Curated annotation (Swiss-Prot):
One function term, GO molecular function aspect: serine-type endopeptidase activity
Compartments (UniProt record): Cytoplasmic vesicle, Secretory vesicle, Acrosome; Secreted
Signal sequence bounds: 1-31
Family that this chain belongs to: Belongs to the peptidase S1 family.
Claim: Signal is one of the keywords in the record: yes
Native source organism of the sequence: Mus musculus
Protein's name according to its UniProt entry: Inactive serine protease 39
Length: 367
């Protein structure tokens, strides 16, 4: 995570992530019991619509509510839904807990394998190499990619549901974010944050103890967002990067951005006293300093019906045959498995559409 004022969600302070990429180059791409207020998320508001049965579930509460003013170091319980997706022992992406057995992440984080046993989910971590008594390492029972997601066009329908073998126990360190429904509207003045364990620069990994970083960002409307991803040779009509299933957010003034290794992590907004996961880190323009473009996030509300349907139609894991819960491990390396998708807008080196497709196909073969 790159940014001049990005904060660590833990005792150490950190920088932020930076990714360099050419247009259409896809880089190697991720207790103590706690009972919060029993008040369910609100039923109606000008910006938040009723959420049906999901409303009845506890979600979106932390010890820290409302705005946290400049420079304050966040504590470990700040983002209790934040998860790390581990692939064969290395952090590759972020993920977000949405109930006791389900998480959301980006589909492109699973491009190397769809075998659940290849993955682990870390929850309750603030520093990946320094698990606490609240940290949990969870095994994965099922990986459900969106049916319309394609490796050949990894910008669309970039969402995945992850089912755990064992339900988590909620605590101040592990708690789900609320999932918005399809009618949820978030205004630009809402408080929104991104978080993750992404890279500090194009060639600099986050160093031990691998602290969680976060940054406040603003939502950007679609019309303004499209202007950041236009070049003389590739118009928005030829390559429509801003689809209905994504949203745009960032902070170009303070140079805050999510990048490689942050993919699949949450963009959360504070709506009527609850934190909602409104986006999942999807892709971004090159965030070489100075950052010239915002980040693009999978719009969670667009997929709310899909999420409900898949959860309802998927049987619970057979606990009797599930592996035992594992001891929370200490991450020793960040590694080159980390996932991310970058597009670089407004570049001096131009690519025609046919060249871009060729370049994309070459990268796909070597990933």
């Amino acid at each position: 995570m790159w940014g001049s004022r990005a904060q660590q969600s833990g005792p150490d302070r950190g920088g932020a992530c930076l990714l360099a990429a050419f247009l259409l180059c896809f880089s190697l791409l991720h207790a103590q019991d706690y009972t919060p207020s029993q008040t369910p998320p609100p039923t109606s508001n000008t910006s938040l619509k009723p959420r049906g049965r999901v409303q009845k579930e506890l979600c979106g509460k932390t010890k820290f509510q409302g705005k946290i003013y400049g420079g304050q170091i966040a504590k470990a319980e700040r983002w209790p839904w934040q998860a790390s997706l581990i692939f064969r022992g290395r952090h590759i992406c972020g993920a977000v807990l949405i109930d006791k057995t389900w998480l959301l992440s980006a589909a492109h984080c699973f491009q190397r394998s769809l075998t659940p046993s290849d993955y682990r989910i870390l929850l309750g971590y603030n520093q990946l190499s320094n698990p606490s008594n609240y940290s949990r390492q969870m095994t994965v029972n099922k990986v459900i990619l969106h049916e319309d997601y394609s490796k050949l066009s990894r910008l669309e329908k970039n969402i995945v549901l992850i089912q755990l073998h064992h339900p988590v126990i909620y605590s101040t360190h592990i708690f789900p974010a609320c999932v918005p429904d399809g009618t949820t509207k978030v205004s630009p003045n809402n408080l929104c944050w991104i978080s993750g364990w992404g890279m500090l620069s194009a060639d600099k990994f986050l160093q031990a103890p691998f602290p969680l970083l976060d940054a406040e960002v603003s939502l950007i409307d679609e019309e303004e967002c499209t202007t950041f991803f236009q070049t003389p040779e590739v118009s928005i009509t030829e390559y429509d990067v801003i689809k209905d299933d994504v949203l745009c957010a960032g902070d170009l003034t303070n140079q805050k951005s999510s990048c490689r290794g942050d993919s699949g992590g949450p963009l959360v907004c504070f709506l009527n006293s609850f934190w909602y996961v409104v986006g999942l880190a999807n892709w971004n323009g090159a965030c070489l300093e100075p950052i010239h473009s915002p980040n693009i996030f999978t719009k969670v509300s667009y997929f709310s019906d899909w999420i409900k349907q898949k959860k309802a139609n998927t049987p619970a894991a057979d606990v009797s045959s599930a592996p035992l819960e594992e001891m929370a491990s200490s991450l020793r390396g960040w590694g080159n498995y980390s996932a991310g998708i970058t597009l670089k807008p407004r570049i001096s080196t131009t690519l025609l559409s046919s060249q871009a497709l060729l370049l994309q196909s070459i990268w796909l073969r070597i990933l």
